[in-house]
Amino acid sequence: MKRNTFTRLAALALTLILALSLTACGGKDNTSADNNDSDTKATVKIGVPNDTTNEARALLLLQENGIIKLADGAGITATKNDIVENPHNVEIVEAEAAQLPNMLPDLDYAVINSNYAINAGLNPVSDSLLIEGSASAYANILTVKEGNETSPKALALKAALESKQVADYISQQYNGSVVSVVENPTDGYDASVDYDALKGQTITIAASPTPHAEILEVAKEILAAKDITLDIQSYNDYVVPNTVVDDGTVDANYFQHLPYLEDFNAQNGTHIVSISAVHVEPMGLYGGKQTTLDALSK
């Protein structure tokens, strides 16, 4: 009797040891109701701009559409480290904004600024899978070096960019991909400016090729009617257009939104100020390997 009891106890102990060993090695109880799908869900790679304000803007777009959740209080300086919920197993891939269209074949999706999307042959309205509203916080601005806000050249350029001609061009040319935010367009001229004194002079401005340099061509015609030359210098990056304003090489620039400018000034010690909000370019989510949002809805 005692021998049989001992045998049964030994068998029971062996069973418990085996069960504990399986658990320690990662064995799962198949009867558990809590099967974590995220362990087996495929990674979804989404490219975003790597500069502070545009990365935050991209992440906010993803959050607004239920793809991720950011920590409370994460706003226009949010980074991927602020992601607190990631139900679709998204991997955020940071890259220079201008390179994201070229990276689409290697990514599932990318969040791209409209100017770079348009330059790559994408239509922000018809080709994007998700798109921002016309958020005024990200309006693209005309800027000058601090102290030059009321110079005749700055005021003449400001009036030309805030003209009805420019607003109409934006509406007709971009069909919603770029939206004018000028509330009361002018006739292109500022009554306080002595245009006769500016005759024969040149205003230099740095801009990105699309759409900024294109829009400036309309302003160029307005200024030319007063015998003022607008010299448009195109740049493909986010740094040089600000440095050439700050060092006085050019009179103004037109390529960025205010949150980016504020961050740039803080990081680089520059003194560049906005004198006009001209248009907004809604940021969009574009498909790469994925052509629908199905990978983000499972």
What are the language-model segments listed below?
Residues 58-59, 63, 161-182:
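Periplasmic-binding protein-like
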Residues 60-67, 75-81, 209-235, 239-240, ...:
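Short, polar/charged alpha-helical segment
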Residues 20-24:
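C-terminal motif of bacterial Sec signal peptides marking the signal peptidase cleavage site
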Residues 138-156, 282-295:
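A bilobed periplasmic-binding-protein/Venus flytrap-type ligand-binding module shared by bacterial periplasmic
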Residues 26-29:
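Bacterial signal peptide processing site
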Residues 74-102, 232-243:
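Short helix-initiation/N-cap motifs at beta->coil->alpha
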Residues 106, 119-131, 263-275, 290:
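Ligand-binding "clamshell"
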Residues 42-47, 198-210, 228-234:
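Short, well-ordered beta-strand elements
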